[in-house]
Amino acid sequence: MIELWPAIDLIGSTSVRLTEGKYDSEEKMSRSAEESIAYYSQFECVNRIHIVDLIGAKAQHAREFDYIKSLRRLTTKDIEVGGGIRTKSQIMDYFAAGINYCIVGTKGIQDTDWLKEMAHTFPGRIYFSVDAYGEDIKVNGWEEDTELNLFSFVKQLSDIPLGGIIYTHIAKDGKMSGPNFELTGQLVKATTIPVIASGGIRHQQDIQRLASLNVHAAIIGKAAHQASFWEGLK
């Protein structure tokens, strides 16, 4: 069964969503982060909660550590955190604060040796986040090009004990227009590492289709704030 990971994106300790990762598209969510955690925690089908420090991702260092630490105390669900994680000490601080998993993106792309070291140091607890327009990988809060190809890069990671690869199709993110099923399916076939789909998920039918592609988990953003998404789920 595909896992469900609702998302909380933070700017200034406020729960927001962006469209296509553009910071000028910031939209405040109807529920606070605290309210969202309480809401998601009632569902047995929620395996973990995905939290992103958006300003940290852009500024290249974590900004919301203390606030995220306070959120950790509000639920028994697993929590993973990403955004601005660039050092081993940051990862260790999050783990010491009770965070279960850390997400590495830009730093892992720019320094694959470091990514390998972190994955071997914390096997199964480091997730690699790859964000792309089509097959073109972006970094630093999705604002910079890398000239790297999604599939070529991911194939380099096959022997690393990562928890998974979080794939965000940027053009779909925040639009509620459905995931990029074609590229997501191709990515699943290109690696033995579990693939987590993010971006564009609208409803349970999207989840079912991702499950048919052998996607390990789905990160749900805007849709998770709609009661209709959760109808019939426990």
Swiss-Prot record:
Its EC number is 5.3.1.16. It catalyses: 1-(5-phospho-beta-D-ribosyl)-5-[(5-phospho-beta-D-ribosylamino)methylideneamino]imidazole-4-carboxamide = 5-[(5-phospho-1-deoxy-D-ribulos-1-ylimino)methylamino]-1-(5-phospho-beta-D-ribosyl)imidazole-4-carboxamide. It comes from the Bacteria. It is an enzyme of class 5 (isomerase). The keyword Cytoplasm applies. The active site is at D9, D131. It holds the Pfam family His_biosynth. Keywords: Amino-acid biosynthesis, Cytoplasm, Histidine biosynthesis, Isomerase. Its main location: cytoplasm. GO terms for molecular function: 1-(5-phosphoribosyl)-5-[(5-phosphoribosylamino)methylideneamino]imidazole-4-carboxamide isomerase activity. Pathway: Amino-acid biosynthesis; L-histidine biosynthesis; L-histidine from 5-phospho-alpha-D-ribose 1-diphosphate: step 4/9. InterPro entries: Aldolase_TIM (IPR013785), His_biosynth (IPR006062), HisA_bact_arch (IPR006063), Isoase_HisA-like (IPR044524), Isoase_HisA-like_bact (IPR023016), RibuloseP-bd_barrel (IPR011060). Transmembrane segments: none annotated. It is found in: Cytoplasm. GO terms for biological process: L-histidine biosynthetic process; L-tryptophan biosynthetic process. One of its GO terms (cellular component) is cytoplasm. NCBIfam families: 1-(5-phosphoribosyl)-5-[(5-phosphoribosylamino)methylideneamino]imidazole-4-carboxamide isomerase (TIGR00007), PRK13587.1 (NF010114). Belongs to the HisA/HisF family. HAMAP family: HisA. This is 1-(5-phosphoribosyl)-5-[(5-phosphoribosylamino)methylideneamino] imidazole-4-carboxamide isomerase. The gene is hisA.
